[in-house]
């Protein structure tokens, strides 16, 4: 994808049209990181113009951009050229010791099929190092591929539920549409399962997550108003099987 390698949230500024972009994430190795942009920076201008409701949507489409960044006491110009790069959605994974327990932290930003191998690797590490509780940070995750959240769920759910292929999610539609889906061969149910097949860029891949089931007893989910779709689905699907505490704002509801 052609990108500057950062994400942001929009906030209304002084006038009815004026906006401020607040940097929420800067991808490692991106033009944004190389230009010195950091999480929490306030962006108030784009190409010598204030950012407004009329022009903020231009930013992702521009091949180059000059951003005006507001600091505590001054402003500085940040220049960037967009590049084609993979934005790794596994932003951060780490392990902490708390009250004689090991707690894993996974900041996951998009259910992207290209991230499956890294997700499996991270979950294997959590398992091997004895992680018993997990903080899953989905605050900026607006969704993605349904098979990928099924794969992650199969590494988070209790191992016995995965071994039984318990129902993870069930789609409910009117009878006509359900029949149409059946004729297309699209299942109405997704199961917890140790082996999954995904199609990535036209190629089929088989993933085995049986050695990557972490065995956690509790999941803490960090959410926000940007948390949507697949991010909401994984929390709904895991609730019957896992103790989940949701922390944050009301999710988008997509």
Language-model features: where?
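Solvent-exposed loop/turn segments at secondary-structure junctions
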Residues: 12-13, 29-31, 43, 49-51, ...
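Gly/Ser/Thr-rich loop/hinge elements
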Residues: 146-218
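C-terminal, low-ordered peptide segments at domain boundaries
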Residues: 47-131
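Terminal peptide-recognition signature
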Residues: 6, 32, 40, 67, ...
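Loop/turn elements at helix/coil->beta-strand transitions in domains of secreted/extracellular proteins
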Residues: 39-41, 73-77, 101-104, 129-134, ...
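Short acidic catalytic loops
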Residues: 43-47, 106, 125-144, 222
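Extracytoplasmic/secreted envelope proteins and their assembly/folding machinery
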Residues: 20, 116-123, 149-153, 219, ...
């Amino acid at each position: 994808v052609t990108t500057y390698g950062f994400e942001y949230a929009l906030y209304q500024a002084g006038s009815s049209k004026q906006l401020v972009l607040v940097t929420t994430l800067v991808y490692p190795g991106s033009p944004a990181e190389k230009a010195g942009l950091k999480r929490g920076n306030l962006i108030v201008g784009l190409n010598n113009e204030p950012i407004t409701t009329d022009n903020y949507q231009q930013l992702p489409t521009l091949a180059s951009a000059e951003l005006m960044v507001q600091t505590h006491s001054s402003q500085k110009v940040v220049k960037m050229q967009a590049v084609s790069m993979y934005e790794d959605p596994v932003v951060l994974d780490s392990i902490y010791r708390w009250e004689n327990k090991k707690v894993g932290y996974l900041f996951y930003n998009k259910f992207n099929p290209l991230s499956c191998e890294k997700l499996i690797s991270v979950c294997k590490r959590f398992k091997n190092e004895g992680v018993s509780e997990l903080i899953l940070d989905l605050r900026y995750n607006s969704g993605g591929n349904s098979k990928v959240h099924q794969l992650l769920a199969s590494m988070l759910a209790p191992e016995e539920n995965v071994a039984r292929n318990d129902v993870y999610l069930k789609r409910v539609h009117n009878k006509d549409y359900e029949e149409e889906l059946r004729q297309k061969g699209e299942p109405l149910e997704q199961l917890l399962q140790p082996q999954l097949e995904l199609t990535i860029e036209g190629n089929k891949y088989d993933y085995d997550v049986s050695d990557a089931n972490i065995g956690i007893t509790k999941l803490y989910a960090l959410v926000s108003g940007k948390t949507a779709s697949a991010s909401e689905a994984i929390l709904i699907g895991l609730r019957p099987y896992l103790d989940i505490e949701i922390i944050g704002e009301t999710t988008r509801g997509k």
